[in-house]
Amino acid sequence: MVTVMPLEMEKTISKLMFDFQRNSTSDDDSGCALEEYAWVPPGLKPEQVHQYYSCLPEEKVPYVNSPGEKLRIKQLLHQLPPHDNEVRYCNSLDEEEKRELKLFSSQRKRENLGRGNVRPFPVTMTGAICEQCGGQINGGDIAVFASRAGHGVCWHPPCFVCTVCNELLVDLIYFYQDGKIYCGRHHAECLKPRCAACDEIIFADECTEAEGRHWHMKHFCCFECETVLGGQRYIMKEGRPYCCHCFESLYAEYCDTCAQHIGIDQGQMTYDGQHWHATETCFCCAHCKKSLLGRPFLPKQGQIFCSRACSAGEDPNGSDSSDSAFQNARAKESRRSAKIGKNKGKTEEPMLNQHSQLQVSSNRLSADVDPLSLQMDMLSLSSQTPSLNRDPIWRSREEPYHYGNKMEQNQTQSPLQLLSQCNIRTSYSPGGQGAGAQPEMWGKHFSNPKRSSSLAMTGHAGSFIKECREDYYPGRLRSQESYSDMSSQSFSETRGSIQVPKYEEEEEEEGGLSTQQCRTRHPISSLKYTEDMTPTEQTPRGSMESLALSNATGLSADGGAKRQEHLSRFSMPDLSKDSGMNVSEKLSNMGTLNSSMQFRSAESVRSLLSAQQYQEMEGNLHQLSNPIGYRDLQSHGRMHQSFDFDGGMAGSKLPGQEGVRIQPMSERTRRRATSRDDNRRFRPHRSRRSRRSRSDNALHLASEREAISRLKDRPPLRAREDYDQFMRQRSFQESMGHGSRRDLYGQCPRTVSDLALQNAFGDRWGPYFAEYDWCSTCSSSSESDNEGYFLGEPIPQPARLRYVTSDELLHKYSSYGLPKSSTLGGRGQLHSRKRQKSKNCIIS
């Protein structure tokens, strides 16, 4: 296809060629222009013309009506722009610019324009070097000479090209400048800038330079809306400037996430033809919305994911069902609590003393707490049973408890504190650490006789708290000290706060102490004390302090001025449903202590502790068969490691303490008989609390605080319950063959509590001893009336209470020939008084 050149353009090129040929210094034409070529070099013979074109590429030979001819015309327009020489070809020039253009064109023609001369290299000459390629030009070869470059400078025909564009100089027209040859376009650009928009030489004083090129001020504008971009922001697209608005509307990408334009100022993420805003909300996982910035991602079906689970539509942190998710949540929480406890226990052991001091000070209640409200709350809290609390135990782990392992807890609690706690539990350790390691653990603290009395009240309570997993356990409050706590100078500095039980699944897996729990309390009178009791000066004082001791162990020294108490762990009750019931009414199903009766006198707890031991020998089997109903308090108890389960005179002999006194039955609470509501054996005399509002107990807290000072100088007596428990335990060990378990429980001094310790063995073997049903406090007496006054004020008496006289106690215990020392610690003090044999209580 032949493109016909417009007539006007053809006349223009012909005129330009005439002007260039007239002003050039080339040789004269040969006069024999060949008709087959559109243009031939002037002054050559026909054979020389063929020789010249034979040196050029075939596609560039300007045969008539050939591609070479079209290339020639194109190169003439490109290398010799008409608007560089003629004003009429320029679009918008003012008069000054027109004058400059004429001067510029005439100067170039006069100083730089020329045409190459093609002739054979003389044979007589040895040869020459091509200026462009450096090749040899031999004699007789066709060479191109440029008169402006000098007579000795020559080129091969294909090497006569522009220095800038390396294109053959059309019709051998060149412009010489500084020893180099140029085409007309690039020579003009060496002298003046050319506008990238209109392709004209810029003769104005100002221009815009951008992207390495130059524009007229008015020509640098948006290619779409023609807005002048001088001094403005622009975007180049395919060599054309665009304003920001036009570029966004024409070329901006859409975000695959939010379907909005990705602005030029916004970061962009691109993958496989997709585009996203470079933000965490857009470039994120399509399933879980996790940010993928700087992270590997998984493309799938036009979306990106963070993992294979998300690409499959699964929840990587979820479970298969809601039921398993609930169970897993509890299991994970339990393991987390256990792991935190073990790890923290390892790190806190070097700083035990400092930590214990901090715990004592941090757990004390502020002085602005209402004592009456506090005591009422304590009573209500301690009476809660697991069946009334619907919160599972794993939810109560959110409280800021201080966890620790069992070895650390053994050195952070006082036996006197923990014996009165309502949730004490001891672990059954069948392994080597169960019986052999515990005496060694306690030996380092009790080997020194000078320290034994004070260490008896130091912190060694951790062994009580062997964690047990029970889903229906009530949530427990962290123990606190009462509002009137004061540090005793004779106490050990290692006494810490009571630790809340935690789960021990990790220990169970690692082969530590067994987490199989003994859920019944061990009766105090069935244990053998293997260390000295605390002195009287360090024991709690005040008869009404049984209110605090029923919920937390109170330690009073120096006449009650320096008293330290620890609140035990409680379960929150529904106060609206208690109807004024006192501490352990719901917990008295298994013969637990009646807290409301203990507040009656200064030593009311002692008789209950000695009498309750025969009523707490069954627990675990009943709990297993009835796990959701009202649970006995025994299920929360544990034996301290300082108790020695001995077949000897268990619970009745205290080394080094002869002046021990047991309070009369008038000072001890009596329990009303109640019947079991289950399908097992019935015990005719069960403990049941009388309904008495907890406010009545709290109101008399101050009046009975010093009642214990009157009861210090009484002669020692023995308790019948101690000897009965000794006979029972020895017959039990002989029948069961478990005499080797005497060291299963450690040593601990006697203390008082409204809540009895549980017998871990009795809970497991309770059905074997169910026939030993008896009660030591079912007799009546009026002797308590003599004790009912303190400082001239009557001590409030609970309704429907009966007390056993001291004569009855003496009658009950005189026939057993008990040793002179009896270890029944009531209200934390040691007292001894002769008792009469009970008139009404007999052994069944």
UniProtKB/Swiss-Prot annotation:
* SUPFAM superfamilies (alphabetical): Glucocorticoid receptor-like (DNA-binding domain)
Q: Where is this region: Disordered?
A: 314-350, 481-519, 639-709, 822-844
* Skewed-composition ranges (Low complexity): 481-493
Q: Which residues form the propeptide?
A: 842-844
> What Gene Ontology terms describe what this protein does at the molecular function level?
zinc ion binding
What are the Phosphothreonine sites (modified residues) in this protein?
Answer: 534, 536, 539
**Compositional bias per record (Basic and acidic residues), positions renumbered to this chain:** 693-709
Lipid conjugation (S-farnesyl cysteine) is at: 841
Which GO terms are recorded in the biological process aspect for this UniProt protein?
A: Wnt signaling pathway, planar cell polarity pathway
- Per the record, the major location class is nucleus
**Family to which this protein belongs:** Belongs to the prickle / espinas / testin family.
- Please name the disease the record associates with this protein: PRICKLE2 mutations have been found in patients with myoclonic epilepsy but involvement of this gene in pathogenesis is under debate since some of the patients also carry POLG mutations.
Q: What protein name is recorded for this chain?
A: Prickle-like protein 2
Native organism is Homo sapiens (Human)
